[in-house]
Structure formats: C-alpha cells, structure tokens
Amino acid sequence: IRLALKNGASAVAAVAVADESGYQAAFDALSMVEDVSVLICGSTDTAVQKELRDSAAQASQARRERIAVVAGAKDESVDDLIARAKELNHERVVLAAPGALDEEGASASGLAVAAAVAGAIAGETDPAVPLGGAELLGLHGLADRYEDKDLDRLILGGVTPVEHVGGVVTVVRGVTTRTTTGQDPDSTWRELSTIRIVDDVIPSLRSALRAKFRRAKNTEQSRGAIRAQVVLEL
C-alpha cells in the first residue's frame, strides 16, 4: 500500500486475506467498487494471478475498467517470467520484473516492484503517456540486472522490465502480457498505453452518446446521427 501511494496512487482500497484461498472472495469484493483503476495482490502464485486477471476482465466488461499488475516469485529467471506471462496472456495484466531487494539487501519477490508500478500507472492521468521512463520510488534496489538481450526477450514475451541505473529505479517499457491470440502471435495489445487509451475513450464516448441520444429510437436516421457523433468525439 505504501509503495502504491508513494508512486502516484491517490487512494488504495484493500481487502485482507488469511491465505491463498481467500483471494477470490477479495477480488469479488473489489469487483463491485467504483473508481478502481489498478489491481494488485500479495501473491506470486500463478493460479491466484489468473483469478486476479479474470476479475479485472470481468469488471472491465461491466464498465469498471481496470488493469491488474502482478509479480514473479523470488529469483525467477527470464525464461520463468516469460512462461508466467504466457500463462496470463491478457491485455489487462502487467507482469513487472525483476524481484526487489528487502531492507537488508536480500533478494525478494517482485511484489514490491509490482506495487510501485501499479502506483505509477494509477498516478498517470494521461493514458497516452508511455510507462517507460517512469521513476519508481521507495524501493531498496532490484534483485537482478538484465542485459540488453534479456530486456528484448522480456518485452517481446509480455514482461514489463524495471532497471536500476545511477541510483534511480525506472520502468524500461510498459507492456501487457497479451502476446498471442489463440496460437498466433499478436502484438496489437503489447503496449500498455493501448488498453489505457481504450479505457479512456470508451467511457467518455459512452457518456456522450447516452447524454445526446437518451431514449432515441433505433432508426436509420438515429444510427446515422450516432455514427456522426462517434466520429466527432474521436
């Protein structure tokens, strides 16, 4: 919570869980909360993260658009992270890496990094601004440093890498875990800014049409007017 707030989140709605089995109920509770833009959880278990992904997707379909940010386990390799992203494979899920260092300088999971990234996403009001280059505050360091070839692999594999250079921790590039559609490679939703722009445009367009065409009949003239209004709004 502290890291999310420190990096830009204006408020945090938290639900406590006793163990891994309690996450689904927590996600269900949060799914009905309005004005939630980013979701995080305190687990690196892939099954729990899939539940978080599904919660974000279902809430978004119900016009409560949101992004989920997850993390890898302690000491996960590049291959492990790419495999995790492949399992999640959704435009509403961001997998942040590497792991963080704790206060004693020991290697830990990526949960702290994910919380900081979530705060940075929540704090950016312009959806078109890329996440890459965003400075992450409050971290004690990173558990790994990626070479350029590894950064390329991670980004193409749906992982959002973070680096520590010159005493500053920053996001290299913000991407989603969506890399395939069916069995085919698909880069349509790779950039995080793509889904964020969609989430910004669609609600605004929906509100404008609702206000202008309240109780309008489904006629050819009305449909033409709606098309014209959509073009105008875009």
Where on the chain are the PLM-derived regions?
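Surface-exposed assembly/interface segments
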Residues: I1-L234
